[in-house]
Amino acid sequence: RVDRSVPLDANWLRAHPLPRHAHDIDKNARGKVLVVGGSRNVPGGVMLTAEAAFRAGAGKVTIATIASLAVPLGLAMPECGVVPLSETDGQIADGAPVVADLAEQHDVIVIGPAMDDADAADSLLAALLPSLSPAKPLLLDAAALRAAARH
């Protein structure tokens, strides 16, 4: 098992400033980020993550979240693509097949913001990790970070 984690401390941030893009570059060349998460209890968490991705320089951001949040998020963030995932009791239910397909279309994957269901996060990781390229950045947050210990 290889530990690919990198501590993001002040020294690392100084050594890796946010990218400056040429004025003639389009959004497709700036990278696509997939944010997977959300729950009824923390509906704004994925929105904050998507906003951070844009501020860091992403050209396109897609949010995959519970179906009941998809329309409100789409209205709040029209610059994002929003993919509804099935849900049970305000948590992602069985999003693994959809998320695995989406992951192939994106450059960076973020799993877990605003998720509080460790089993759902574990299911997503189990579906993604075997097929995810080691070169593709994967950021884990909240329940996904806790679930990663099982893998």
Name every feature range the model reports, one short phrase each.
Residues 1-151:
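Small-residue (G/A/S/T)-rich helix-start motifs and N-terminal tracts that mark the onset
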